[in-house]
């Protein structure tokens, strides 16, 4: 991050008069991180610039608190990470925390910092930390959410429903399957994918309806090919990653949503619809994921998928809007006082 020399002290002026404060949004490019970062940014109602980051090896293999010479660890890619500095930064994930802190330092302490997820180091230097309940992080600057913040809103769902209006003609019920993949906690083998595909095929054969399925990058080419081979003959669609992304349209049209257990982000997005959410169990897990899944079951949001589809509802808690309003008020208050640190 050579564009952030340690001696740089340039900054943008506070937003004047009725001008909206401006933000930079930092994330590592992973879809879940990007969704959370953009969701919070959109919820503030402030203009922002998205700045995906690239973390170079060997730093990419280490937690940020162990990085030596961090100015060389990260690049903003095609986006400049130099002055003029924004009024505030939204950083998502630990890999974005280091550049966020360096921006604050380079701005002379004038740029306000909001961090999504526990940075696990130098927490007192962030003005706001938005952390999910299962992280068990508490403090005067911590805003606790039920799951992950996200981009799902009623307006976006309705707009995407209209944009992909041809999908509305599919036979009901429409079952949506959101398939993730292996991560540090879970394993998604081809055998387990075959079991999931067979369960979905059995459901559609017995009860009719349609399937809208989207794999993720972590599903892998072989996994996606398997799903297509076993489920491609049923009414519906399996997104191949090309063209416009129908993800939000799928959520809007769903009668029930099935999500693999590895993704807090996708489960949180599904839960923002108020529709039945089934979790497809995978091998593995850890204490943090178990806390999340237990919380979602206790709230009446999710149930394990056992081969049948039922109907239930639950109150939608819009933590993203709450976090966005909190951050916006914090930024405006800081600017209104003529200070940002």
For each predicted feature, which ranges?
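Short, structured helix-loop element that forms part of the nucleotide-activated donor/catalytic region
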Residues: 217-231
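Short internal beta-strands
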Residues: 51-52, 130-131, 211-217, 281
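Leloir-type glycosyltransferase catalytic cores
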Residues: 294-341
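Active-site and donor-binding regions of nucleotide-sugar-utilizing enzymes
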Residues: 25-144, 150
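A nucleotide-sugar donor-handling region in carbohydrate enzymes
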Residues: 123-189, 305-313, 317, 321
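Catalytic binding pocket for nucleotide-activated donors in carbohydrate/polymer assembly enzymes
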Residues: 265-314
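Conserved catalytic-core segment of nucleotide-activated headgroup transferases in glycan assembly
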Residues: 182-215
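Donor nucleotide-activated moiety binding/catalytic core segment of transferases
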Residues: 227-265
């Amino acid at each position: 991050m050579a564009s952030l020399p340690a001696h740089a002290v340039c900054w943008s002026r506070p937003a004047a008069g009725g001008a909206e404060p401006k933000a930079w949004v930092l994330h590592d490019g992973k879809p879940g991180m990007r969704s959370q970062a953009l969701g919070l940014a959109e919820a503030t109602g402030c203009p922002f610039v998205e700045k995906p980051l690239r973390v170079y090896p060997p730093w990419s293999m280490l937690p940020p608190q162990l990085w030596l010479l961090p100015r060389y660890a990260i690049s903003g890619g095609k986006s400049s990470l130099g002055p003029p500095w924004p009024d505030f930064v939204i950083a998502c994930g630990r890999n974005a925390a280091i550049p966020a802190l360096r921006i604050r330092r380079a701005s002379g302490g004038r740029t306000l910092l909001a961090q999504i997820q526990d940075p696990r180091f130098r927490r007192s230097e962030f003005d706001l930390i938005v952390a999910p309940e299962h992280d068990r992080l508490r403090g005067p600057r911590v805003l606790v959410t039920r799951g992950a913040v996200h981009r799902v809103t009623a307006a976006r769902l309705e707009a995407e429903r209209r944009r992909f209006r041809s999908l509305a003609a599919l036979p009901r019920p429409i079952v949506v399957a959101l398939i993730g993949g292996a991560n540090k906690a879970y394993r998604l083998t081809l055998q387990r994918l075959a079991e999931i595909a067979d369960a979905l095929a059995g459901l559609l054969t017995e009860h009719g309806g349609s399937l809208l399925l989207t794999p993720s990058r972590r599903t892998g080419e072989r996994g996606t090919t398997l799903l297509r081979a076993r489920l491609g003959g049923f009414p519906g669609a399996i997104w191949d990653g090309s063209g416009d992304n129908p993800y939000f349209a799928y959520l809007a049209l769903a009668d029930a949503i099935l999500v693999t257990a590895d993704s807090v982000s996708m489960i949180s997005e599904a839960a923002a619809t108020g529709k039945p959410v089934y979790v497809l169990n995978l091998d593995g897990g850890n204490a943090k994921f178990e806390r999340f899944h237990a919380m979602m079951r206790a709230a009446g949001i999710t149930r394990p998928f056992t081969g049948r589809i039922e109907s239930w509802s639950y109150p939608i808690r819009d933590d993203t809007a709450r976090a966005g309003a909190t951050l916006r008020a914090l930024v405006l208050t800081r600017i209104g006082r003529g200070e940002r640190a």
